């Protein structure tokens, strides 16, 4: 039997000839090497970043759900007897949404917003849609991005957390602030989604005998469409994609205004909504065929 072969004729591996203690010391030394320590820190940093991303995704979902509920509430204005009561309730709901956005701002404090933008963009777009819908109902105008950004500036009083360490004598109390700035793309996509809600509001208002709202909405949508037309295909892909949906909403509202102007006296008010819904379905079918 060869001296290099162990019992049973199996050839010994080279590392089997090393003493056991020597192998353990080599393993411990490799774990404490600068390279291993560097990769260990990279692992911890990536794990922390992934955990933060998941928390932001969850907050974005909550913001989306609460914003949609606010939009559904605002649609009741066309049939509700007390408009102010619904506006007050919608404001309290939007305050709750802003508390969620405050948590997002706290998570992103000291971080690069663009690294986590994909996690929160859906919720921010839905919030823009809800707050701009409420603003249009109140003022018949479009809320600016600067106004929304002002609403997304928070202090320690907004979060309900006061600083536990009192300021020293002669030092003024520093006010902790958190800001979350919308990107222009988030704002534009939220406004583009708003046009679909305004189209539904137009049809619902006609069904309740409100003849003025469709013409106000039509004029507003034309201005929004003209603004988006200046961007055209030069802007982000998502914006140019929304432009087609915006054009559809404008066509449906203009069709409703045309029917009101030309045939409004022929059709009873309680049947107007049914006529418009049939015509919008016909428009959808024609566009799908083309």
Curated annotation (Swiss-Prot):
Q: Give positions of region: Disordered.
A: 1-31
Its cellular-component GO annotations read:
cytoplasm; endoribonuclease complex; Golgi apparatus; nucleoplasm; perinuclear region of cytoplasm
Q: Main role?
A: Acts in combination with TSN as an endonuclease involved in the activation of the RNA-induced silencing complex (RISC). Possible role in spermatogenesis.
Name listed for the protein in its UniProt record: Translin-associated protein X
Looking up Pfam families in the UniProt record yields: Translin (PF01997)
Describe the processing and modification events after translation.
Answer: Sumoylated with SUMO1.
What keyword terms does UniProt attach to this protein? Cytoplasm, Developmental protein, Differentiation, DNA-binding, Golgi apparatus, Isopeptide bond, Magnesium, Metal-binding, Nucleus, Spermatogenesis, Ubl conjugation
The UniProt annotation places Mg(2+) binding at 129, 197
Where does it mainly reside?
Answer: cytoplasm
């Amino acid at each position: 039997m060869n001296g290099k072969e162990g019992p049973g004729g199996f050839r010994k591996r080279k590392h089997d000839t090393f003493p056991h203690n020597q192998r353990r010391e080599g393993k411990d030394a490799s774990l404490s090497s600068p390279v291993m320590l560097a990769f260990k820190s990279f692992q911890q940093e990536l794990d922390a970043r992934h955990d933060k991303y998941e928390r932001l995704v969850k907050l974005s979902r909550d913001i989306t759900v609460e914003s949609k509920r606010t939009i559904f509430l605002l649609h009741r204005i066309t049939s509700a007897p007390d408009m102010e009561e619904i506006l007050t309730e919608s404001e309290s709901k939007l305050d709750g949404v802003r508390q969620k956005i405050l948590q997002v701002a706290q998570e992103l404090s000291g971080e690069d917003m663009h690294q986590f933008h994909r996690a929160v963009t859906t919720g921010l777009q839905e919030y823009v849609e809800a707050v701009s819908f409420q603003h249009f109902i109140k003022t018949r105008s479009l809320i600016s991005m600067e106004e929304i950004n002002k609403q997304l500036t928070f202090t320690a009083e907004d979060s309900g957390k006061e600083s536990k360490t009192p300021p020293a004598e002669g030092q003024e109390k520093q006010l902790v602030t958190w800001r979350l700035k919308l990107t222009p793309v988030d704002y534009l996509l939220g406004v583009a989604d708003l046009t679909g809600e305004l189209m539904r509001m137009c049809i619902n208002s006609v069904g309740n005998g409100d003849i003025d709202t469709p013409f106000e909405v039509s004029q507003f949508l034309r201005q929004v469409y003209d603004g988006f037309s200046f961007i055209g295909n030069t802007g982000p892909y998502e914006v140019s994609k929304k432009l087609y949906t915006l054009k559809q909403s404008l066509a449906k509202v203009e069709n409703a205004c045309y029917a009101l102007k030309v045939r409004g006296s022929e059709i009873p008010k309680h049947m107007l909504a049914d006529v418009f819904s049939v015509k919008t379905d016909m428009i959808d079918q024609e566009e799908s065929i083309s």
